[in-house]
Amino acid sequence: MRVLGIDPGYAIVGWGVVDYAGNRFAPVDFGAVCTDAGVPFERRLDEVYAGVKDVIERTQPEVLAIEKLFYQHNQTTVIGVAAARGVILLAAAQAGLPIYEYPPMQVTQAVTGYG
């Protein structure tokens, strides 16, 4: 199974693609979609959407794994990340990908073994 994992944001969207078979992961590709702080917010969301859509088209994942929204004290950041998650989820839904959401702590523990 090919999995696209995404760390959502509106400044930087980190992504990685792995193939999973027989309890083993094999890296396929990884990168980031970066947006410029000097660009209007709606344009940044468009860039996130286009970048994620391109990754989906190029790598052909079967599922999307994404971090759930983590509440922070900075409401402006939370709202921005929520909007970015929305366009990421839209790109995945339009591609017909099943979406699996995980809390940030669970992602950290799975990747590092602790957290």
In which residue ranges do the predicted regions lie?
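Phosphate- and other anionic-substrate recognition elements at nucleic-acid/protein interfaces
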Residues: 1-115
